[in-house]
């Protein structure tokens, strides 16, 4: 029978000092011997997705202690990608994922916690905590802060739904008046919560449901809705049930590495493809798989992208649906139900929402709105927006008049009526990206599935933005932004501003964009990121010259630089002749701090999840 990890610091005469310190935190004599459950919170006043999390740890703690555990809360950092966007702050976003993972590991291992609840929400926080949870391999439940309500405003007497990207595009569009731009800006982000579309934060919170590590509704229930309170309480109860199963019954199926198995990663990727999730999710799933010692790779993603249809289309890929609409249609469980009926889901995998001996099949039987007989579950998925600006959680209890169970023309479709029979993400490969690259096909217009254009090369995002706004980029160009990968940036910046500016200048369907950086979940258009190897690692993207012909064929999963092998070999020799300046941008002026340099020294390219190069850390 596994011994409580916390016994290391609570048992024996030699631990008198540790027990004295535990007592100073509120632990009583009769508490010693109970499991200690760490609560990793990520409250901050910097981030709308986290501004309401201050008291959530107390909710979880109450449920844990009621179930017989000792709850101890700590906090991690949280970077807002939207606020960090468009300036040097974005260099810190992806590296913060590693810091979050490390900080959770440090706190849990330093204090010998027995289990973990992760309270996350936004872009790098959920994946960072996920990496830590799989690294630690102790019982864990994830519960997020939830998505914000979609913005709404009237323009030309027409009520429209909005999100963050709409505000950015409008501000960059000279045809939009100052008055309308300001109106959109003030309406785009009305409440606390993660941004309202299928951006990175919401994508990752949905994927934790499919991995089996969070409760139904985690990815889609609005931050403002009163029903979300129960998710926090149930997370506390569930983690205690998992803790007892492992430590008292020697049930290893309660551990995250046994829950998040290869099959579970396939389920998560199937969901991601079906819902057209953010391309960043590929980066984070690959990173999490490495922490779990699961051999899930880009090849698996490529294979699945050809098999899984696009069943759910959400902003930024459409203005019609946001996360509140996904929830009304049954949330993640609704999409998983359709994947199951299409024969594209493993249902024999464990899930934290299942009782001992149960699995995803039993969870779907209860929570898939198309098969459940539970009226409470149907009411749960009818939770809707109030339309009242607020930063407070659980501040409203509005309901939709009905569920969206239209699987022909609704927000979630059956396979027969899918938005497309191929999914919302694709892996492209060719001589421009030997190890692959990623495109969010859910955001690509059908007219752009194949594209041939001339390279317009920039060695930084800043230069690309200046070029787009300055009129250098014209229809037919393929904008190439390089040296923005994990090592070359460093930090693998998001390219939301370049894609937004292309869109605002009417070039959204007339140009393509290729980068070894990454894209915000808010990106749409023919935007191809994660080019691997990156420029700083000797990738072919570093050898592209202005005017080179680039051929993109999404149906064939191909991306080609139409330059002969002999010419590429000659360019590579010229690059190597630079000596210490090889594979570095010559014209870019950028301050890189010591913290970022330390990150860059160990960073791998995107096809490896941009994680640390373990070979450099081994003895």
Swiss-Prot record:
Cofactor(s) of this protein: [2Fe-2S] cluster; Mg(2+)
InterPro entries reported in the protein's UniProt record: Dihydro-acid_dehy_C, DihydroxyA_deHydtase, DiOHA_6PGluconate_deHydtase_CS, ILV_EDD_C, ILV_EDD_N, IlvD/EDD_N
Residues annotated as the enzyme's active site: 520 (proton acceptor)
Keywords, sorted A to Z: 2Fe-2S, Amino-acid biosynthesis, Branched-chain amino acid biosynthesis, Iron, Iron-sulfur, Lyase, Magnesium, Metal-binding
Gene Ontology molecular function: 2 iron, 2 sulfur cluster binding; dihydroxy-acid dehydratase activity; magnesium ion binding
Gene3D superfamilies, A to Z: IlvD/EDD C-terminal domain-like (3.50.30.80)
The protein's annotated pathway: Amino-acid biosynthesis; L-isoleucine biosynthesis; L-isoleucine from 2-oxobutanoate: step 3/4; Amino-acid biosynthesis; L-valine biosynthesis; L-valine from pyruvate: step 3/4
A single cellular component GO annotation: cytosol
Residues annotated with N6-carboxylysine modification: 124
Cofactor stoichiometry and binding remark: Binds 1 [2Fe-2S] cluster per subunit. This cluster acts as a Lewis acid cofactor.
Reactions that this protein is recorded to catalyse: (2R)-2,3-dihydroxy-3-methylbutanoate = 3-methyl-2-oxobutanoate + H2O; (2R,3R)-2,3-dihydroxy-3-methylpentanoate = (S)-3-methyl-2-oxopentanoate + H2O
Residues given in the record as Mg(2+) binding sites: 81, 123-124, 494
GO biological process: isoleucine biosynthetic process; L-valine biosynthetic process
E.C. number(s) listed in UniProt: 4.2.1.9
Residues reported to bind [2Fe-2S] cluster: 122, 195
SUBUNIT field: Homodimer.
Assigned protein family: Belongs to the IlvD/Edd family.
Known function: Functions in the biosynthesis of branched-chain amino acids. Catalyzes the dehydration of (2R,3R)-2,3-dihydroxy-3-methylpentanoate (2,3-dihydroxy-3-methylvalerate) into 2-oxo-3-methylpentanoate (2-oxo-3-methylvalerate) and of (2R)-2,3-dihydroxy-3-methylbutanoate (2,3-dihydroxyisovalerate) into 2-oxo-3-methylbutanoate (2-oxoisovalerate), the penultimate precursor to L-isoleucine and L-valine, respectively.
Record's protein name: Dihydroxy-acid dehydratase
Source taxonomy: Bacteria, Pseudomonadati, Pseudomonadota, Gammaproteobacteria, Alteromonadales
């Amino acid at each position: 029978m596994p011994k409580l990890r916390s016994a290391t610091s609570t048992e024996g005469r030699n631990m008198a000092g540790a027990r004295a310190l535990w007592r100073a935190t509120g632990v009583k004599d009769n508490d010693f011997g109970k499991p200690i459950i760490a609560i990793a919170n990520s409250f901050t006043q910097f981030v709308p997705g986290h501004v309401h999390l201050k008291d959530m740890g107390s909710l979880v703690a109450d449920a844990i202690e009621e179930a017989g555990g000792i709850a101890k809360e700590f906090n991690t950092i949280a970077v807002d990608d939207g606020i960090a966007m468009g300036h040097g702050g974005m260099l810190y976003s992806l590296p913060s994922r590693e810091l979050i993972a490390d900080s959770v590991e440090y706190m849990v291992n330093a204090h010998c916690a027995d289990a973990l609840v992760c309270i996350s929400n936004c872009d790098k926080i959920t994946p960072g905590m996920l990496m830590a949870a799989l690294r630690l391999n102790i019982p864990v439940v994830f519960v997020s802060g939830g998505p914000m309500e979609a913005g709404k405003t009237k323009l030309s007497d027409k009520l429209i739904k909005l999100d963050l990207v709409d505000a950015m595009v409008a501000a960059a569009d000279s045809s939009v008046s100052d008055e309308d731009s300001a109106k959109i800006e003030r309406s785009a982000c009305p409440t606390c919560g993660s941004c309202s579309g299928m951006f990175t934060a919401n994508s990752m919170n949905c994927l934790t449901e499919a991995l089996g590590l969070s409760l139904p509704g985690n990815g889609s229930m609005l931050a403002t809705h009163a029903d979300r309170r129960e998710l926090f309480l149930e997370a506390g109860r569930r983690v205690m049930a998992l803790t007892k199963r492992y430590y008292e019954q020697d049930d290893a199926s309660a551990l995250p590495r046994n829950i998040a198995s290869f099959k579970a990663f396939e389920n998560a990727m199937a969901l991601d493809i079906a819902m057209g999730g953010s391309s960043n999710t590929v980066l984070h799933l690959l990173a999490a798989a490495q922490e779990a010692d699961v051999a899930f790779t880009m090849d698996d993603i490529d294979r699945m992208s050809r098999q899984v249809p696009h069943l759910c289309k959400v902003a930024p890929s459409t203005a019609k649906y946001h996360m509140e609409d996904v929830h009304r249609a049954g949330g993640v469980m609704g999409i998983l139900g359709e994947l199951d009926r299409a024969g594209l889901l493993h249902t024999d995998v464990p899930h934290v929402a299942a009782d001992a001996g149960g699995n995803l099949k039993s969870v779907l039987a209860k929570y898939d709105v198309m098969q459940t007989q539970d009226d409470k579950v149907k009411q749960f998925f009818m939770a809707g927006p109030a339309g009242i600006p607020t930063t407070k959680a659980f501040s409203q209890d509005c309901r939709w008049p009905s569920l969206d169970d239209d699987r022909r023309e609704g927000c979630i479709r059956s396979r027969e009526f899918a938005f497309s029979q191929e999914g919302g993400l694709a892996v492209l490969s060719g001589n421009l990206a030997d190890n692959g690259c990623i495109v969010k096909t859910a955001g690509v217009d059908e007219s752009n599935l194949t594209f041939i254009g001339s390279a317009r090369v920039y060695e930084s995002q800043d230069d690309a933005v200046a070029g787009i706004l300055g009129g250098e980029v014209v229809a037919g160009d393929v904008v190439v932004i390089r040296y923005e990968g994990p090592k070359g940036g460093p930090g693998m910046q998001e390219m939301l501003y370049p894609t937004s500016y292309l869109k605002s200048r009417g070039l959204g369907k007339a140009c393509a964009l290729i980068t070894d950086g990454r894209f915000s979940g808010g990106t749409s258009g023919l935007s191809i990121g994660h080019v691997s190897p990156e420029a700083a690692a000797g990738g072919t993207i570093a050898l592209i010259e202005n005017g080179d012909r680039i051929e993109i064929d999404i149906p064939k999963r191909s991306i080609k630089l139409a330059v002969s092998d002999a010419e590429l070999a000659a360019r590579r020799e010229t690059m190597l002749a630079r000596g210490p300046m090889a594979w570095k941008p010559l014209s870019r002026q950028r301050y890189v701090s010591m913290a970022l340099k330390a990150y860059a020294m160990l960073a791998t390219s995107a096809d490896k999840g941009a994680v640390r190069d373990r070979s450099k850390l081994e003895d």
